[in-house]
């Protein structure tokens, strides 16, 4: 990519991030972003195929910081229960803090992009390692099911419609995904 194209893309991401923070993701259209930047819609869509795609790239900086701190949890805590509990607390707080961006990403047309992203792979590897057993297929399945339980839409539904507290949500996940021996470590 040419230097000016890279700079344009960064400018788009910065202005979008600013507008999303100030007015909310749902209140900002791609047209509004283009007007704010003084660029044509073609230029905007050359860099980002839709709003979901733009949201995905806007959140990348936060994801990189998140992953660095997330990995530190395994060094700071020793039992599987502690690691899982603290990591879930951290992940759920991240979801709350970035709810509208994450909703926009998940609502997009390219759902596979998230599952193929470095962020998803980092989460997968983290929990796969925690659940590791002799049955690799089961461990992968269990890890994927946990991550599906942590999708923004499932989490929001449980909190907003089932009226489950965040702490209860975390505790239910601990009960489902860690067996009794691990919970009592």
From Swiss-Prot:
| Entry GO MF terms | DNA binding
Q: Boundaries of each HTH tetR-type domain copy? A: 6-66
**Where the record puts its DNA-binding region(s)?**
29-48
Q: Which keywords annotate this record?
A: DNA-binding, Transcription, Transcription regulation
InterPro entries (UniProt xref):
DNA-bd_HTH_TetR-type_CS, Homeodomain-like_sf, HTH-type_Tx_Regulator, HTH_TetR
- What domain of life is recorded for the organism? Bacteria
Q: What name has this protein been given in UniProt?
A: HTH-type transcriptional regulator SAB2452
Q: Which organism is it from?
A: Staphylococcus aureus (strain bovine RF122 / ET3-1)
């Amino acid at each position: 990519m040419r230097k000016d194209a890279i700079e344009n893309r960064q400018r788009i991401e910065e202005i979008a991030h600013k507008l999303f923070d100030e007015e909310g993701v749902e209140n900002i259209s791609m047209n509004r972003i283009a007007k704010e930047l003084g660029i044509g819609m073609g230029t905007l869509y050359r860099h980002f195929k839709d709003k979901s795609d733009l949201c995905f790239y806007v959140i990348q900086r936060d994801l990189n910081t998140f992953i660095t701190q997330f990995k530190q949890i395994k060094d700071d805590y020793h039992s599987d229960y502690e690691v899982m509990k603290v990591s879930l607390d951290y992940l759920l707080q991240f979801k709350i803090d970035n709810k509208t961006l994450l909703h926009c990403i998940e609502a997009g047309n390219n759902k596979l992009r998230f599952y193929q992203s470095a962020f998803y792979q980092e989460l997968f590897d983290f929990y796969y390692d925690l659940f590791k057993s002799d049955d690799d297929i089961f461990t992968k399945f269990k890890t994927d099911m946990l991550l599906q339980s942590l999708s923004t839409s499932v989490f929001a539904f449980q909190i907003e419609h089932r009226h489950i507290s965040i702490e209860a949500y975390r505790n239910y996940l601990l009960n489902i995904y860690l067996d009794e021996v691990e919970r009592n470590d």
